[in-house]
């Protein structure tokens, strides 16, 4: 059984999100919905407290009681089950991919996308500090002179979905998670470097699934104004911020 969950992490208070489904084909694709006639179909909701702890309520024909794991707590009719997972505090735009469940052995393997060169990170409270890593570079195509590639295949409400639309669809629609965008762009012929420019895509691999934003402006002091979706304010919420010149040079920019 293959399951992909797209979640937004709250840094304060509680966040509640509901999902239902059985299968998905790729990261950041929607699932097919809960089916009561499917022996492996299920749905669940979960809350995330201020410490980043996950609290799950399961409904349907499968739940984590079928697994032998520990650490994060799931609730099904007020029975507690354990799941061996890491704590994901202060990350945004995460698609948690739980793959390769086998009912016979009752085991599970978590496959995480990594991909992409770019800014590495460390965290202090809710602040992300990046350090420079060389960006891949390739020339031949550009966002400004490109053409629309087709439908937006990224998950609605995520940063990748917003940026694809913001650039008019003039990039690939199957670049995967944000962490992979720099490499995918370079492979497709776009220029990727550490120099911000209006209309470029800012990309980083910080967190497990990275983040992308659209460059709205570059100020005279080198600071960069970006707009973005699902960065600290929930899926589907577009916000803007200004990044210092020092930090800006640590991100990848796709042109």
UniProtKB/Swiss-Prot annotation:
It is found in: Secreted. Keywords: Repeat, Secreted, Signal, Virulence. Residues 1-26 form the signal peptide. Residues 134-255 form the Peptidase C51 domain. Pfam families: CHAP. GO terms for cellular component: extracellular region. SUPFAM superfamilies: Cysteine proteinases (SSF54001). Transmembrane segments: none annotated. This is Staphylococcal secretory antigen SsaA.
């Amino acid at each position: 059984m293959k399951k992909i969950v797209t979640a937004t992490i709250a840094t304060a208070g509680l966040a509640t999100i509901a999902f239902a489904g059985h299968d998905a084909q790729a990261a950041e694709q929607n699932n097919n919905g809960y089916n009561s006639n499917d022996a492996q179909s299920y749905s669940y909701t979960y809350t995330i407290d201020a410490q980043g702890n996950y609290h799950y309520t399961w409904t349907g024909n499968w739940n984590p009681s079928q697994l032998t794991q520990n650490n994060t707590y799931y609730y099904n009719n007020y029975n507690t089950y354990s799941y061996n997972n890491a704590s994901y505090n202060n990350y945004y735009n995460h698609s948690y991919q739980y793959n390769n469940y086998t009912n016979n052995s009752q085991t599970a393997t978590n496959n995480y996308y990594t991909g992409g060169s770019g800014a590495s990170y460390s965290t202090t409270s809710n602040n992300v500090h990046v350090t420079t890593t060389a960006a891949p570079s390739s020339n031949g195509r550009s966002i400004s002179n490109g053409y629309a590639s087709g439908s937006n295949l990224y998950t609605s409400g995520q940063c990748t979905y917003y940026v694809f639309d913001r650039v008019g669809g003039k990039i690939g629609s199957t670049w995967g998670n944000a962490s992979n965008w720099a490499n995918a762009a370079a492979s497709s012929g776009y220029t990727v470097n550490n120099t911000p420019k209006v209309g470029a895509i800012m990309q980083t691999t910080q967190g497990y699934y990275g983040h992308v934003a659209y460059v709205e402006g570059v100020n005279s002091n080198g600071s960069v104004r970006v707009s973005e979706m699902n960065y600290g304010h929930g899926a589907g919420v577009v916000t803007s911020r200004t990044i210092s010149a020092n930090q800006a040079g640590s991100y990848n920019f796709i042109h």
